Amino acid sequence: MILTKAQYEEIAQCLVSVPPTRQSLRKLKQRFPSQSQATLLSIFSQEYQKHIKRTHAKHHTPEAIESYYQRYLNGVGKNGAAPVLLELANEVDYAPSLMARIILERFLQGHEQTPPSKSVINSMLRDPSQIPDGVLANQVYQCIVNDCCYGPLVDCIKHAIGYEHEVLLRDLLLKKNLSFLDEDQLRAKGYDKTPDFILQVPVAVEGHIIHWIESKASFGDECSHHAYLHGQFWSYWNRFGPGLVIYWYGFIQELDCNRERGILLKASFPTDIVTLCHSTA
């Protein structure tokens, strides 16, 4: 789904004052019925992540951490089965999984002789049964499963969706009988930064020569696209020539402004691929 900047900003504006919950996503779908659920979810997640980055620091001051921890202790002291940590995260407008990390780190600091390592924290968040306190383990679990934008569960889902779309792209290339090298093959050849697929024989799409294709299972907004441009796409262009980026969940139309410089954006696999023998694949 390709949106104009105005259409995107209308959706983003609706997300300013809503909590990152599945109920909010359902309301967003009702407000914009013509947009796909996947596109709205991607925008929803990206906008919330921007908000979290802007407000992250205030939640990590020593005063804030101690305040949250004492509120957690008071809450579970009254009712350990209540979703104390989840409700605290929602109240202070912070991602539940990130709030769980704050409280878990603070708990371990008070119960362990040495500060917990990042790997230990991550392992406990992935598997709360490792947490040496049953009440806290349950509280952390509630945060993880109810967070639709952050946390190990969301990370696993995003990884699976990204892989699924890479497999889809591979299948479409094979169906079109287009020869390619994938990321693993390219790294085996010594390349450190590579697109998902390099075409062994270039093709043309909408009059533009394409040497490589990158799959992005997300919506291409201004922030993420500019980060990808400078972190990935221009590097690919510099090494392999012009290429194509597929944002499977759509992008802002105005961002497709580098076609003449060698980076083409699409929201789906192109249907008008022209091979060197001048036939449509």
Curated annotation (Swiss-Prot):
Descriptive protein name: CDAN1-interacting nuclease 1
A Pfam family this chain is assigned to: TPD
Species: Mus musculus
Task of the protein: Plays a role in erythroid cell differentiation.
Keyword Ribonucleoprotein attributed: no
Chain segments annotated as coiled-coil in the UniProt record: none
Any GO BP: erythrocyte differentiation
Location (main, coarse): nucleus
Annotated Gene Ontology cellular component terms: cytoplasm; nucleus
Locations listed in the record: Nucleus; Cytoplasm
UniProt xrefs under InterPro entries: CDIN1
Keywords in alphabetical order: Cytoplasm, Nucleus, Phosphoprotein
Chain positions with Phosphothreonine modification: 114
UniProt key word Nucleus: yes
Gene field: Cdin1
